[in-house]
Amino acid sequence: MIRIKNVSAYYKTVQGTVKATEDVSFEIFDNEIIGIAGESGCGKTTLMKAIYGNVESPMYIAGGGIELEVDVHGEKKIITNQEIHRYWWEYITYVPQASMSVLNPVLRIKDQFLDSYLRPEVRALGKQALLQRMADYLRELELPPEVLNAYPHQLSGGMRQRVIVALATFVHPRFVLADEPTTALDVVVQRGILTMLVNLQKQLQNTFIIVSHDMGVHYQITHRMVIMYAGKVAEIARTDEIFDHPQHPYTEMLIDALPRVGDDQERAGISGRPPSLLDPPSGCRFASRCYLADERCTQVQPALVEVDPGHFVACLKREPSAQMRAQASVVRGVAHQ
């Protein structure tokens, strides 16, 4: 499990401090594929860097923290965000954007595998045994083992992306973060990458965190979704709930703007622009674009509230369902006994 607690991640720039994410809190469960969605600049990639512990200037963590809970020989171990970098590859790995810029252009793929796995228990296998394991693993992922002898420029974009996923999952980490894993790939290759990710997650029974601006990617493979807007979490729910019963006006407008098969009706985008994260508004950050907004929305920042079991929304216009109110009443009653 990953617990994200009130994380605020900022950037220092010559124009001022960019509040890329602010007071972000939610939990990522074991054995799930969770998606993080939202417009460009909403804080998705910044949040991924914070979770991975890859925080470098000008980015810094202004508040909050992150905990990874992992099982080590039958005992629970808590890893804080200050320690996460020590457990890269072993417990948590990251599949970044832009496959060509990730792979070293002057090294063969096999050498990049060998350089990545410096853990003593892995290296103890010996080079030839390790290369054989790599070849076997590539076959499992339906990749020809011959790619181990190739240079990155000799592989297609889709093949490079598959190699990066293989690199990230070779030692079966508990958490795999993938940032826009299908960007710049054609539809057929995208489908192959998504199928690969789903099959890997089922095989490894681990947790995948997928960042994508493409709602279709989330619809196809994620179990739950986190919708972000202007550095804040707007909504969290099961993926089917997000698509069938969106509660936040921003999510609703995102879903309404998606094209439908067999529907030639022109879809309207969301009018207006997100607020500047150099000086975000004090109230709801979506208020200036929201059809439900009133004066209170511009002044009061909404909290993330559970409106239905497992369905969280940050909107002053949405209230907990009768079921949630009844549960809260029972909890209060027990507390007063």
Give the residues covered by each predicted segment.
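The feature captures the beta-strand-to-loop junction immediately N-terminal to the Walker
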Residues: 37-39
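ABC ATPase NBD coupling module
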Residues: 72-93, 119, 241-246, 276-281
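Conserved ABC ATPase "signature" region
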Residues: 128-146, 255
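A short, proline-enriched helix->beta-strand linker immediately N-terminal to the Walker B motif
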Residues: 170-174
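P-loop NTP-binding/switch modules centered on Walker-like glycine-rich loops
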Residues: 181, 185-265
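Short catalytic/signature loops enriched in Gly
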Residues: 236-337
